[in-house]
């Protein structure tokens, strides 16, 4: 058994529902999206950060099982300069933002307590604000 399955079995015995955040490898999110759909069916909430690519096989799973898709979009900063909605990942060794992210991102929510699916757009600065990100 893999560790996640063991943890889920223990949680199921306790009757606790999980709230899970997943940032899978952008190169192959399919198995992670499939697992998120399974976890939703088991009663758990899964929130994922994914590449904004709606032309993929894994996006069809999102259409069938997710409840919310939030496209992360650009914005004008306080000086009026345009900022893309692309998320810069922090290098764990240097602590500095990695360069070269050429794709946008989206947040996908799998929630067993909500029916249907909605798509929204939210500027990256608002997401940072809501998340407590400090400049």
Task: Give names to the regions the model predicted.
Residues 1-135:
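Class I S-adenosyl-L-methionine-dependent methyltransferase catalytic core
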């Amino acid at each position: 058994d893999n560790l996640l399955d063991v943890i889920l079995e223990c949680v199921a015995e306790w009757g606790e529902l999980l709230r899970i955040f997943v940032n899978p490898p952008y190169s192959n999110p399919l198995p992670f999206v499939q697992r998120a759909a399974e976890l939703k069916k088991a009663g758990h909430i899964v929130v994922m950060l994914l590449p904004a690519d709606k032309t993929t096989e894994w996006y069809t799973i999102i259409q069938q099982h997710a409840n919310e898709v939030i496209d992360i979009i650009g914005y004008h900063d306080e000086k009026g300069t345009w900022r893309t909605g692309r998320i810069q990942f922090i290098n764990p060794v240097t602590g500095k933002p990695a360069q070269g992210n050429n794709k946008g991102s989206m947040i996908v929510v799998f929630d067993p307590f909500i029916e249907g699916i909605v798509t929204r757009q939210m500027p990256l600065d608002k997401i940072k604000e809501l998340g407590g990100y400090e400049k």
